A protein has these predicted regions:
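Catalytic P-loop NTP-binding/switch module of NTPases
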Residues: 91-103
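A general structural motif
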Residues: 162-171
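Residue-level detector of high-confidence beta-strand sites
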Residues: 81-83
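Phosphate/pyrophosphate-binding loops at sites that engage ATP/ADP/AMP, CoA/4′-phosphopantetheine
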Residues: 171-183
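Residue-level signature of catalytic and energy-coupling elements of molecular machines
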Residues: 27, 62, 95, 170
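A short acidic Gly-Thr/Ser loop motif
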Residues: 60-67, 73-76, 85-89, 184
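Nucleotide/phosphate-binding catalytic cleft detector across ATP-hydrolyzing
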Residues: 1-59, 78-79, 88, 102-103, ...
């Protein structure tokens, strides 16, 4: 073979070796073989995107509890990745802070009654801070009525405010990765 130019596109991912060895050993102790160790953004890309999407070009936003990964694929491969140090846990923390409640209560409110889209009916709906069976235990939430219920509209407002901050960061990340595709 003869060539004037040789090129290669590679992605180098750094990881602490100890956790990888621990996971590999745990899998092997279960009498299974580890075929490969793959970075989370690459695994998410293969799990969530079709080969055609990865080929044509797409952005993938992966929301985690502590971080949000923004990755861009084109020509079938990962072109770039930005990790934002914000995630769904920040939404939970904002709810806990806004209403002066415990984190587990905030997580339950987010999962059971939360939404990323406000609705006019939210202003009429009062939601219980405590889980069924736990009524009148723990502190009364800020802005709550005598039955420790809060307006759903206030919960949605806290959630959408946090998500707006996160979306600003996602938008910045996409710009830094050169992604100019249509949104939606």
């Amino acid at each position: 073979l003869h060539a004037e130019r040789l090129g290669v596109d590679i992605h180098v991912m750094l990881a602490d070796g100890a956790p990888i060895r621990n996971i590999t050993e745990a899998v092997q102790n279960a009498h299974l073989q580890v075929e490969a160790v793959v970075g989370s953004p690459i695994a998410a890309g293969y799990a969530c995107l079709s080969p055609e999407e990865r080929d044509l070009g797409v952005a993938l936003v992966e929301f985690g509890a502590e971080v949000t990964n923004v990755s861009v694929y084109a020509s079938g491969m990962l072109l770039g990745l930005v990790t934002i140090p914000m995630g769904s846990g920040d939404v939970t923390d904002a709810i806990a802070s806004a209403f002066g409640i415990r984190r587990f209560q905030a997580e339950r409110l987010k999962c059971v009654h939360g939404s990323a889209i406000a609705s006019p009916s939210d202003h009429r709906e009062m939601i219980p801070v405590n889980a069924p069976g736990d009524e009148m235990t723990g502190p009364i939430a800020r802005h709550a009525d005598d039955k420790n219920r809060i307006p759903r509209a206030e919960l949605i407002s806290v959630i959408t405010e946090q998500l707006a901050r996160l979306m600003e960061e996602v938008s910045r990340a996409l710009k830094s990765l050169g992604f100019t595709g249509q949104r939606g």
